[in-house]
């Protein structure tokens, strides 16, 4: 899917589910890493993470668009557009927009280091490097050592 198809999909979802038109731009932003999408308050544009579409398909993309359109329409109407606001919760429930999207990578896939306890042999996956002089095994309080550097 390209940005033109994404724009048309966003406009059609806005018309069908919200009964309001989407007058700004929706586009894929490959720099997004930890979020499915975001609504930009200044320009009123919607950015979508292309990795969400690649991994989870069009149904996940539609859910993300609905979520971001909730922010968009409430902000345009000068109502509560933040996640904590009652207006946002009410509208997102009405249109079936989820509060969160699925994570692109789980913790095990993101892990860069594997540590092993010298006492009990337990292994620990970590994204960031750990100071083995300070950190100990949570199970037996044994000494940790870097077993494997994955990436």
UniProtKB/Swiss-Prot annotation:
Catalytic-site annotation from UniProt: 68
Record's keyword terms, sorted: Cytoplasm, Metal-binding, Zinc
Record bears the keyword Zinc: yes
InterPro entries in the cross-refs: SprT-like_domain, SprT_Zn_ribbon, Uncharacterised_SprT-like
MF (Gene Ontology): zinc ion binding
A Gene Ontology BP annotation from the UniProt entry: response to stress
SMART domains recorded: SprT
Protein name as annotated: Protein SprT-like
Species of origin: Staphylococcus carnosus (strain TM300)
């Amino acid at each position: 899917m390209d940005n033109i198809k994404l724009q048309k999909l966003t406009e059609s979802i806005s018309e069908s589910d919200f009964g309001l038109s989407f007058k700004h731009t929706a586009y894929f932003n490959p720099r997004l890493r930890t979020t499915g999408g975001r609504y930009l308050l200044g320009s009123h544009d919607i950015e979508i993470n292309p990795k969400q579409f690649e991994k989870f398909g069009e149904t996940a993309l539609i859910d993300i668009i609905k979520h971001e359109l909730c922010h968009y329409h409430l902000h345009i109407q000068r109502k509560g557009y933040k996640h904590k606001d009652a207006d946002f919760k009410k509208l997102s429930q009405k249109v079936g927009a989820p509060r969160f999207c699925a994570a692109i990578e789980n913790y095990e896939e993101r892990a860069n280091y594997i540590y092993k306890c010298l006492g009990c042999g337990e292994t620990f996956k970590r994204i960031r490097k750990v100071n083995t002089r300070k950190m100990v095994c949570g199970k037996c309080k044994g000494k940790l050592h870097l077993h494997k550097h994955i990436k």
